[in-house]
């Protein structure tokens, strides 16, 4: 009987606590109950779903290394999801968890939000919508934080994500102006926030074709980011920008930084950094034997099997430049046989084979390749 009485007392105490945790009461117990519940249950699950979706997007994104890479990866801007359709189910789950946290744990009393986790929920809401390509709805969430949570720890991130969203909505000049204003508050930004803002400024300037300005900010982003995947990507983009303005030596210096990261950054950046350096090779003054050894090492490295198509294409270009056409033909065909995912590269292989045959007056064979 005593045990039953004790159990009953415990239940009564728990019920009293739960009743006391009203969303309409501005009490310490209520605030902390709803903050903890939002943080360690709903928001935690939402963040997990968001990270899974973003990681899957980054992993599955097919970069076009023939053009300047985008700062961040999103699905094609030409793809518009149908109503109720999500780019990735993980982003839909993240959005649902954010909405649930806001609906169940918001404690707006006398016009003031008392639950310190609700701004986190709005950030998650905006990010999930952003990656789901619903940019206007994402903008609503970031604007809500900026309007109603001026003392939030997420203010800098909300401003950065708002600018990112403005860029996606083709309001690039507005985004650039707001990011410059944010960077003027440098003392208020932590290192990663500064890196993120600088990266998006670089993206804005690339869209505006102001490559000199983009170079300034991609350098800051590459130096400051704590994420090695981003560091490798940003230094690679910086190399591409220098190549684009004809500064090949400066481009190569940045490709070397990508190569030096080695396993700390995805291998695709390192391989393409080598490839771009090889394209910048001066066949009149450069050490051709050393270049041959580099290409041989790249081809024979088992870890480079996913990249054999581009390595063999570059080997073919080497042979073509040193006048060994038979070897060039063999390597263009090897590149085609590797059957990589880069269809543009395959077209370059066929075009090169067509050109070689055309130059040798083999017009019928050339026509077949064209």
Give the location of each predicted region:
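Sequence-pattern detector for short linear motifs
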Residues: 9-10, 229
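Acidic, polar-rich low-complexity tracts and alpha-helical solenoid repeat scaffolds
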Residues: 20-370
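Hydrophobic h-region of N-terminal signal peptides that target proteins for export
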Residues: 13-21
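Bacterial N-terminal signal peptides that target proteins for export
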Residues: 1-9
């Amino acid at each position: 009987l005593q045990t039953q009485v004790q159990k009953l007392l415990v239940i009564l105490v728990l019920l009293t606590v739960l009743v006391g945790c009203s969303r309409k009461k501005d009490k310490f117990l209520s605030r902390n109950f709803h903050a903890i519940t939002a943080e360690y249950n709903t928001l935690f699950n939402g963040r997990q779903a968001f990270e899974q979706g973003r990681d899957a997007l980054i992993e599955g994104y097919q970069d076009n290394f023939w053009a300047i890479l985008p700062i961040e990866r999103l699905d094609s801007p030409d793809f518009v999801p149908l109503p109720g359709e999500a780019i990735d189910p993980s982003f839909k789950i993240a959005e649902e968890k954010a909405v649930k946290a806001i609906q169940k744990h918001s404690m707006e009393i006398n016009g003031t939000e008392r639950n310190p986790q609700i701004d986190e929920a709005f950030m998650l809401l905006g990010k999930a919508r952003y990656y789901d390509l619903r940019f206007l709805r994402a903008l609503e969430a970031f604007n809500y934080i900026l309007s109603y949570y001026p003392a939030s720890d997420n203010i800098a991130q909300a401003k950065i994500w708002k600018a990112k969203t403005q860029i996606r909505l083709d309001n690039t000049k507005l985004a650039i102006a707001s990011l410059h204003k944010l960077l003027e508050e440098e003392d208020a930004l932590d290192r990663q926030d500064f890196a993120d803002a600088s990266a998006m400024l670089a993206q804005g300037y690339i869209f505006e074709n102001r490559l000199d300005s983009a170079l300034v900010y991609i350098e800051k982003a590459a130096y400051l980011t704590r994420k090695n995947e981003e560091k490798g990507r940003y230094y690679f983009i910086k190399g591409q920008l220098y190549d684009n303005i004809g500064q090949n030596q400066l481009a190569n210096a940045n490709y070397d930084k990508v190569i030096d990261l080695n396993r700390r950054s995805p291998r695709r950046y390192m391989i393409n950094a080598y490839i771009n350096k090889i394209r910048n090779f001066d066949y009149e003054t450069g050490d051709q034997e050393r270049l041959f050894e580099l290409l041989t090492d790249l081809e024979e490295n088992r870890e480079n099997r996913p990249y054999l198509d581009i390595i063999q294409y570059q080997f073919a270009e080497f042979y073509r430049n040193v006048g060994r056409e038979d070897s060039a033909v063999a390597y263009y065909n090897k590149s085609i046989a590797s059957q990589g995912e880069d269809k543009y590269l395959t077209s370059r292989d066929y075009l090169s084979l067509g050109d070689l045959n055309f130059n040798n007056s083999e017009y019928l064979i050339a026509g077949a390749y064209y």
